[in-house]
Amino acid sequence: MQVLIGTSKGLMVYEILPEKIPKELAIHFLGFSVNMIFVDERSHRWWVGIAHRHWGQKVHYTDDQGTCWKEAKLPSYQGFKMINGAPAKLKEIWSMQHGGADSERLWLGTEPGGLFSSTNGGVTFELNEPLWDHASRQKEGKWFGAGSDFPFIHSIEINPHNSSHLYVAISCAGIFESMDNGASWQPRNKGLLATYLPNPNVEVGQDPHQLLMNPDFPNVLWQQNHCGIYFTKNGGKLWTEVFLKKGIS
């Protein structure tokens, strides 16, 4: 089994075998920070998001496990603005996900909170305007950065039984669900607590750190949150905190 590890000094590839010390196979993009790694299980293509200090953000992919890398066209915020009227600019690539049964669909999560999609296998990406223009975003303070200047989309989960159904996790804003391939979005944060805010029960302003879906039961999701670990059995309509007497909780 191969394991890909993104670090501030490059992409590390290791071979993991039972009862053996992991073996380093390769280092790619030596000296550059690799912020995002995604392996498309459908095509086995590797994708990476790279932060160059001089050239900024870059997206690269390989179809032969790193023998040959190609640079993809970056998603663009050209023509879009932040809520304060300033021009929106790509700051960081955070996450990627495939489109399930839609073989050419890819989703890309970024900072400052834009979700991009591709319908041609990553040749081009377009900003998902319904989420970018979501009413909850237009009120300053509802979407904000956590450990960063701006909100960012770090998790994207696709229903394997219905590729039009997806969730994104935004820090800070919360979990949002779309049932129509991104044409509309609903916040799904009931039951979460944002103890760092004056009103901890806010619908938008939550800080999920990671979101995972059970592929066999897509209504079951888990999230590691700034304020605890939560799960839902009804697709995010209500979240329940996990309480453990011992261990992580």
Regions found by a protein language model. Name each.
Residues 1-249:
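Extracellular glycan-interacting surfaces
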